[in-house]
């Protein structure tokens, strides 16, 4: 009887006693593990750690989610680069560029490639290419020099990964040195000089570079730059160490042209 009375008393006290709020337990995070990549929550390491077993179960997904977040960030960066580029090319080539570049192709989507860039890029030291979306970008340092839409040219330049050397910064990842610069000359389109009958724009924007070169550029000369183009295409035969050698090669016909504007410099290195 006494035991029954004690139980009833305890139950009654529990029913009338006010509920005391428990102290809030601070949210626990794994030290140094709260991460957001490019504003994308990876949902792996920034959740409350409620137990070791739960956390260990989540760890298997973290590398995958981190990778997905990083890829999303890269894609946004590439899209932004294309948007900036499209905004810039809508202005058209500058007067300074127009006389020394390959003009717009049939669809009007390419940018001019300066003869000076073609010449300087042969040494593969200052310029590099990088895949940006569906285009091939030509950089000097961090500055975007030219961007060629692959869909318009069927462009397939030769890429060669160059090993990193002392005191030289080479592209990383899918940024590769531009060692097929000569192929950029073989794109369809008109040139800034007075065009001959055999030098007209190509019909199809998706032909290969070789086909385009045969159909469009046979007999054509880009005023002031044929020597540069020839050396770019035949890069292995260029001896950059001797300017005298370059002069003699020009005199032997490599860079001959009717250069009425005098745009080719005497040493064959193009406009400075």
Curated annotation (Swiss-Prot):
Keyword line: Glycoprotein, Signal, Sporulation
Cell compartments where the protein resides: Spore polar tube
Glycosites: 134
Major place of residence: other
Position of the signal peptide: 1-21
Lineage: Eukaryota, Fungi, Fungi incertae sedis, Microsporidia, Unikaryonidae
Function summary: Involved in formation of a polar tube through which the infectious agent is passed on to the host cell.
GO CC list: polar tube
BP GO annotations: sporulation resulting in formation of a cellular spore
Coiled-coil annotated residue ranges, if any: none
Ranges of biased composition (kind: Polar residues): 263-272
Name of the protein described by the UniProt record: Polar tube protein 2
Pfam families per the UniProt record, alphabetical: PTP2
Basic and acidic residues compositional bias, start-end: 234-247
Disordered as annotated region, ranges: 231-272
Cystine pairings recorded for this chain: none
Species the sequence originates in: Encephalitozoon hellem (Microsporidian parasite)
Keyword Signal carried by entry: yes
């Amino acid at each position: 009887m006494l035991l029954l009375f004690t139980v009833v008393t305890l139950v009654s006290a529990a029913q009338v006693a006010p509920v005391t709020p428990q102290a809030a337990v601070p949210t626990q995070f794994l030290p140094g593990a709260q991460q957001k990549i490019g504003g994308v929550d990876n949902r792996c390491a920034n959740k409350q750690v409620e137990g070791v077993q739960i956390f260990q179960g989540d760890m298997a997904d973290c590398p995958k989610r981190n990778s997905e977040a990083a890829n999303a960030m890269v894609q946004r960066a590439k899209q932004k680069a294309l948007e900036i580029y499209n905004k810039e090319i809508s202005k058209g080539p500058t007067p300074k560029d127009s006389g020394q570049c390959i003009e717009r192709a049939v669809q009007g989507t390419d940018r001019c490639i300066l003869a000076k860039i073609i010449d300087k890029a042969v040494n593969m030291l200052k310029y590099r290419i990088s895949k940006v979306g569906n285009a091939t970008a030509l950089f000097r340092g961090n500055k975007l020099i030219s961007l060629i839409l692959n869909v318009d040219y069927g462009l397939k330049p030769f890429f060669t990964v160059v090993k990193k050397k002392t005191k030289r910064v080479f592209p990383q990842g899918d940024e590769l040195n531009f060692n097929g610069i000569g192929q950029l000359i073989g794109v369809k389109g008109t040139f800034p000089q007075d065009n001959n009958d055999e030098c007209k724009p190509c019909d199809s924007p998706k032909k290969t570079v070789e086909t385009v070169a045969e159909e469009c550029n046979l007999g054509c000369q880009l005023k002031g730059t044929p020597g540069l183009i020839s050396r770019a295409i035949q890069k292995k035969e260029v001896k950059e160490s001797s300017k005298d050698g370059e002069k003699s090669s020009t005199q032997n016909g490599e860079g001959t042209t009717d250069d009425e504007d005098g745009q080719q410099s005497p040493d064959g290195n193009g406009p400075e």
